[in-house]
Structure formats: C-alpha cells, structure tokens
Amino acid sequence: KDKNSKIIIGDKSAVLFQDELLRVKKNKSKEIKISTNTKVVILVVFKPSHLKNISSSNITKIKNIYNVKKPWGYEKWLTGSTNKNYAFKKIFLKKGSKTSLQYHIKKIETNFLFSGNAKLHYMFKKIPLKKKNFLKISKSIKTKIIKNGSVINVNPKTIHRLEAISDLMLFEVSSPHLSDVIRVSDVTNRPDGKIKNEH
C-alpha cells in the first residue's frame, strides 16, 4: 500500500471494492501484489503463457461489468459482453431455483461453486440431442449433491443443470460462445440461445 492506503500495482495503484475486477492484458505483467487488512478471496483466470513479460501499464480496472437478469437470479459478465477470447461470469442462483436443462455445441465451461449447496443434474450418455427426445433423456439424467469449493467441468454436448439447494454463488470461465445454449427443458419455457429481454 502507499501512504494513502491505496493498493500499489507496480507504478499504478487502484482501490478495489466487492465485485470489482482488474484486467491484465496478455503478456504484459510480471507480478501483482495485493495488500489488505480484511479477508479477501481472489480468483485469477489466465492461460499459463500469459504470465510472461507482463508490465503494470497494461493492468486496468473494469468499471462497467455487464449485468444479465435471469429468472433464477443473475449473471455478471466480468469480462464484458464482447470478449472474443474467453468469458468470466459471476453467477447467483436463488434458493429453490434451477437453470435450464441444457447443453452446448461448442462452448466449454468450468464452474467453481464459491458458496452454497446445489444439486447437479447431468448426463454423459450419447442420445440424439433433440427436444423431442426429452422423455428418453430424462430417464438417463443423474444427480449429485455438490458443495462450496466444488469444480464442475462441462464439455460440449454434456446435458447439465444446477438446482439451488441454498442461495448459490459460482464463477464460470468458458469459451466465448455465450449464445450457444440448447435448452432441453426450462421452467419458464425460454427458447434456445440468448434471451433478449434478460440483457
């Protein structure tokens, strides 16, 4: 920290509050130091090769996080709505709610369950993925209780759904295919893809 208690980042400083984010541009920073007098949780998303030749002049504070309303809670797109390299989301689900039973054609995602308990509905079995096969699909769905600290990797064509046993907070890192959502079943009958009135 400097004498005014601002966090020093090389030759730059920034004060971060809850839900704020710093972005480090590819191949620019060597070291990030954080000083705090309260407990904080820091999530870092990067490709290993991006840690070479980093300079502090390419660290920026994200001011406008993209917010998306959902019937089950909300998403905060921490990397914005136009990042072509990857997506990083903070996701909140209300207790008792559930996401669509869905799969993706291209999108690959990893979810970190930060707080709360959930029931994961999933299926790896290869069944022709069409909505008219829902009865066949539903008989093959497995469930598993997951708790905070769990990590879920979802590959393309894996049917999945999260059901919130308690309020849930999770972080998702994925490929940038954010409209690639095929909804096999949805409580509110939402169609496939991006829902305009949520944005």
Q: Language-model features: where?
A:
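Short, conserved beta-strand element in jelly-roll/cupin
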Residues: K1-S5, I91-K94, Y103-K126, V173
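Structural motif
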Residues: N4-K6, V41, K98, N117-K119, ...
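Short acidic-glycine-tyrosine-enriched beta hairpin
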Residues: K6-S29, F124-K157
